[in-house]
Amino acid sequence: TALMGDDFTNSGLFMFVADKAADLSAGNLYVAKISQTSAKGGPAAASDFSIKWIHLGHATSAEIEALANTVVPTDIMDVKYTDPNDTSYKKIGYDGANNWVKLAPNSKLPADKLTQAAAFLETHRYAALQGASMAFTKMEGTTVNIKDKIAYSAMSRIEKSMTTDEYDVKVAQLKSGAVYAHELKGGQVDNNGKAINSEWVSTRMYVPEGLAGEDIAKDALGNTSNIDKISCPDNLKFSEKMRTLFIGEDSGYHVNNYLWAYNVDTKKLARILSTPAGAESTGLHAVDEVNGYTYIMSNFQHPGDMTFVPAVETAVRPLINQNFKDGYSAAVGYLAFKA
């Protein structure tokens, strides 16, 4: 089972369930239908959703490769960017704008191949056409806590399509973002009442205690997110041995981006690494128990890539230019913990 979102406005939560374990060459694709159980317009930190799944289609890698090599977008979907005043089109949100869409009426593809191509090659628009909740903004990394059957998704910024009620989700804007947890269960069915062949299906999505950022007025250093909380979470990795979720930031709201460690038992959040000003904390990986150690791989890129307040610009820019080749170099490293 593969669970993922994508870095998009009006993105969905998608799930792929392979026909055979450890073989992703064939399977079923699903998209989430969200029901908000928390207060509409309430704080993102308290947001809570139940999830059902819409079946989009089944395919093999060979089938999709063959389609990709033979069709063009207009063979799949008829898309208008202004209202055609035609009820055969459905209005959808797509990357922050309105589209009016329907399956291509004069496609060269037979009906079964048309819907398959739409599901796997025009996934966003087809998911919206099928009634999915295309609400999410900036959904980034996903990881899993196997023991507790909890997955985690980074919502780098909570804004735009998540703050209206057009797409089944309405929470207060939180540019600092949050990490959402997914409760994973078996015994689920799709919108057609057909069993989903997985024990790892998300049925609930919520923000755990301590995993929401906080927007603030700009401080003296230029931070617009509280530096003692996460901001724009991006990379996520979970260490089963340490019972810890590691969170890397890609934020323009912290002058220095951080790598955080969140213990899922104590709910304690700790900052364990700071990158140079303007750099992104990325390349995150957790490797449990190698020769008695757990390793956290991490790197940073594009140091100095932000507009600093004057005092920081004067103090920091020369150091970035001197130490990181005018901002064009990066560094890769690791932290080691005794297992």
PLM regions with names:
Residues 1-339:
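Sequence/structural signature of beta-propeller domains
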